[in-house]
A protein has these predicted regions:
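Non-heme di-metal
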Residues: 1-286
Length: 286
């Protein structure tokens, strides 16, 4: 690790988009950047552990063409490898935060953990999770590329981790699309409408604008840098206010970030009528 280098492109962090960021010292910005990057790694780990692998394991209980079944097994193995890579990276960077646990900022209540565990084991009835996988993995492609093209030096361990992540995610996006083609279009229209509404809610609640975990990042920043404690309430307020900032929301999801997912939304009437972060329907020209 190189303690003096940022871990993530600054524009991928929410506080960068808040006015108070310009008032922080360079050292304060740097430590915030590093803490947010650790949280971002946690988010990848949680998504792959709580959603990705269980969904794929459940799908492998179904009959698939040999080529796709082999792809799904490879998908599971690669998700395991990614999780371990980001776990070890966080532990090397911040042993005081991760010495005996994997998550410092991502905290999911027991009720939601149990509900999610049940839901992801029923991907045929709840194919919304395939949309979440496609959306998040296509977004990961964009983020990993941002690490590689960043003009100023980032910590090389983080750049290398995202280079390796990028190498697999392109395949994962293709497999996600194949699964959607196989399961979504054959589902009953009512099931698709219900799943689309659940998807919109989950996206806003867990994968949208800053909420609980990002506030814990700010809390840790103020704990490590006591001179920021007086500013903590205002930092929290401004970060939460980003949920109403449409320009910021488009930095999370847009046609530049997730073009294939949004193009598929355009083709599905059940998504075109929903309010989704960063999404505005376009004509498919059919």
């Amino acid at each position: 690790m190189q303690a003096g280098k940022p871990f993530i492109p600054a524009d991928l962090t929410p506080l960068f988009h808040a006015p108070i960021y310009r008032e922080l010292k360079e050292s304060e910005r740097l430590r915030y950047n590093q803490l947010h990057a650790l949280y971002f790694n946690e988010q990848i780990m949680y998504f792959e552990t709580a959603l990705g692998r269980p969904i794929l394991t459940a799908l492998l209980r179904q009959e698939w063409p040999d080529r796709l079944a082999d792809g799904l097994r490879q998908f599971v193995a690669e998700e395991l490898r990614h999780t371990e890579m980001f776990r070890q990276l966080n532990r090397r960077c911040a042993p005081h935060l991760y010495g005996e646990r994997d998550y410092r900022f991502v905290e999911v209540p027991a009720f939601w953990t149990a509900a999610m565990r049940w839901a992801v084991n029923h991907p045929l009835s709840l194919p919304l999770f395939l949309w979440l996988m496609l959306l998040q993995e296509e977004r990961s492609l964009y983020y990993s590329k941002a690490y590689l093209r960043h003009p100023s030096p980032l910590d090389p361990a983080f750049v290398e981790a995202h280079r390796l992540h990028l190498a697999d995610e392109a395949k994962h996006v293709r497999w996600d699309e194949e699964l959607l083609d196989a399961l979504w279009l054959r589902a009953h229209p009512l099931l698709r409408r219900v799943n689309a509404k659940l998807f919109a809610w989950m996206l806003e609640e867990f994968f949208g604008a800053p909420k609980r975990a990002q506030l814990r990042v700010l809390d840790e920043l103020a704990r490590e840098l006591p001179e920021l404690r007086g500013r903590l309430p205002e930092m929290r307020r401004q970060v939460l206010a980003l949920s109403r900032d449409e320009a910021y929301r488009k930095t999370l999801y847009s046609r530049e970030i997730v073009p294939r997912t949004f193009a598929r939304f355009d083709e599905c009437p059940e998504f075109r009528t929903l309010s989704l972060c960063g999404y505005q329907p376009q004509s498919t020209g059919g």
